[in-house]
A protein has these predicted regions:
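Sequence termini and other peripheral, non-core segments
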Residues: 1-158
Length: 158
């Protein structure tokens, strides 16, 4: 998404830097990232933080090789440099999109969708979430959603 933002605003730079080709051009988060420089800057910082978490969770790759980061990090320096090509039209981030179709009950009117994404993950992503290697489950992540409680309650009645 960041590479696409750069390709939209600075295709020559993108080609010279050898960053990924355009992908997800019309995805709401891709549009958001390229809308303003401050949005883009936040997305770059999030990209770095996500890579740091990835390295922390998986310090070794198969064969015992030290994990120095996701392969996409090879584009990080170019993405940082490319910030100057993103329109500097606001001192504030624009409202971040809430991209989880089929879960409208989770969406909020807030400009920053933390509450909405927490609800979405607690309702739909619980089955794959694992908290190990020193990470504890966030307090907002209900370990037993209401639907599971109802199933267990029904089982105990029979």
């Amino acid at each position: 998404m960041l590479c696409t933002a750069v390709r939209v605003h600075a295709p020559e730079f993108a080609d010279e830097a050898g960053i990924y080709k355009t992908a997800y051009l019309n995805h709401p988060c891709t549009q958001w990232a390229r809308e303003t420089r401050i949005n883009y800057r936040f997305a770059v910082r999030l990209f770095k933080a996500m890579n740091d978490e990835y390295v922390w969770r998986f310090p070794r790759r198969s064969g015992g090789v030290v994990n120095t980061g996701h392969a996409s990090m090879r584009h990080f320096d170019a993405l940082v440099e490319a910030e100057k090509y993103i329109p500097d039209v606001s001192n504030f981030m624009t409202p971040h999109p809430q991209c989880f179709s089929g879960w409208d009950e989770c969406k909020t009117d807030e400009e920053w969708p933390i509450v909405a994404y927490r609800a979405f993950y607690a309702l739909d992503k619980m089955e794959f979430a694992r908290y190990n290697k020193g990470r504890t489950m966030p307090t907002w992540m209900n370990p037993m959603p209401d639907w599971q409680e109802r199933i267990y309650d029904e089982d105990s009645d029979s």
